[in-house]
């Protein structure tokens, strides 16, 4: 299963090479979850995940506990995938004026450059625009991710 987000340094393309070396386990622990490619490939019965980025944690909590509401909030960005809208929304977030940070994270991850969520020294997101991408093509992947978390 694929992850609903991209993540710089993710292991989606490499897991086929090291999966056979993962020992049997009762509890899967992922201290730096990021995009979660390994977990979504394994889909363990029990797992503990963590990350040091509060937006990543907020996003995955919403995927797990409230995926339909998250999808509904993401859908509000569907007609805002052009370059001007992207920079306007990014600036609103940096001013603390975005109400659904989980949906914003998905938006910036998918519309921003290469899934990178980059911050400047002030902690503001400054990820450049990548291009317009249909966000709704990820809704079923979000649902699948929810079932695996």
Model-derived features: positions:
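SAM-dependent nucleic-acid methyltransferase catalytic core
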Residues: 1-14, 21-22, 66-149
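SAM cofactor-binding core of SAM-dependent methyltransferases
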Residues: 20, 24-91
């Amino acid at each position: 299963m694929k992850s609903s987000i991209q993540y710089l340094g993710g292991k989606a393309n490499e897991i086929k090479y090291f999966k056979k070396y993962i020992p049997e386990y009762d509890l899967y622990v992922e201290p730096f979850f990021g995009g979660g490619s390994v977990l979504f490939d394994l889909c363990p019965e029990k797992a503990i995940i963590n990350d040091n980025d509060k937006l990543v944690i907020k996003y995955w909590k919403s995927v797990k506990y409230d995926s339909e509401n998250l999808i509904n909030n993401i859908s509000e960005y569907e007609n805002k995938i052009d370059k001007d809208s992207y920079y306007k929304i990014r600036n609103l977030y940096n001013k603390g004026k975005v109400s659904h940070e989980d949906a914003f994270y998905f938006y910036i991850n998918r519309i921003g450059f290469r899934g990178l969520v980059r911050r400047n020294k002030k902690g503001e997101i400054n990820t450049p625009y990548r291009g317009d991408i249909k966000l709704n093509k990820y809704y079923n992947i979000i649902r699948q991710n929810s079932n695996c978390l």
